[in-house]
Curated annotation (Swiss-Prot):
Reaction(s) the record says it catalyses: L-glutamine + H2O = L-glutamate + NH4(+)
Chain sites annotated for binding substrate: S66, N117, E161, N168, Y192, Y244, V262
Keywords: Hydrolase
Family from the record: Belongs to the glutaminase family.
Enzyme class: hydrolase
EC nos: 3.5.1.2
Taxon lineage: Bacteria, Pseudomonadati, Pseudomonadota, Gammaproteobacteria, Enterobacterales
Entry-linked HAMAP family: Glutaminase
GO molecular function, one term: glutaminase activity
Protein name, as recorded: Glutaminase
Amino acid sequence: MATVINNAMLEAILAEIRPLIGRGKVADYIPALASVSGDKLGIAISTVDGQHFAAGDAHERFSIQSISKVLSLVVAMNHYQEEEIWQRVGKDPSGQPFNSLLQLEIEQGKPRNPFINAGALVVCDMLQSRLSAPRQRMLEIVRRLSGVADIAYDPVVARSEFEHSARNAAIAWLMKSFGNFHNDVATVLQNYFHYCSLEMSCVELARTFLFLADRGIAPHLDAPVIAPIQSRQVNALMMTSGMYQNAGEFAWRVGLPAKSGVGGGIVAIVPQEMAIAVWSPELDDAGNSLAGVAMLEKLTQRMGRSVF
């Protein structure tokens, strides 16, 4: 029988996971991320029937980083036909590091999926082509989905990432050489880094991503965020490609669609039931939150939830 969810259960999971602190490494490739304390632990759940649970540092905001790639894809789905998106970016796992150029060169500038850096940059390039103010549009959508009006970009993080953008710029220019990048590289990179610099808490992330647990419907909004088939497709991509090259191991241990970021956050979806957000800044070798994955593993075992 599945366990009933409550805050005490979440607190107990955090207590069990806390000994893992110190085994991972906080992202240090930009100073703004390296300064975050590694001992943070947070978890939040929002359910489709309107319940909300939280424990630990669930109300503290952090840099969501690559979790934003899901949101930029959702925005693109609202402004492009399906074939327009998928002729420029694939739907398959890459099996390579998220910032690899090797596979991109071999496959002639078409990224494997929208959740590696190359794929997310193509999506951002598409948004630049179709939206007059892509950064403002993203902020509006996140604030609307979360119901929180003061969510914002962290300009220090965005600037720091832009100052250390050589590899991402190389990815963009390589795709441009293959005709799969249409706008000014610096402009699109600025948009991309601003999306990554969004500061949100576990509580805000769980509420923001709840639409993916309910066939594209956010409970507090009048219109669907995306169509039911699109919600299913996004969840499928999260399952196969949301945890970088560790997607298979994560499916084995947790069994849910999820997306991670190097800020230490992970969002996971239990279809038709709930959205879960966890945060622990120390990362494993693949760039996923070490304690965050363990939290989700404990939680799914305790709840008896999995898509398998």
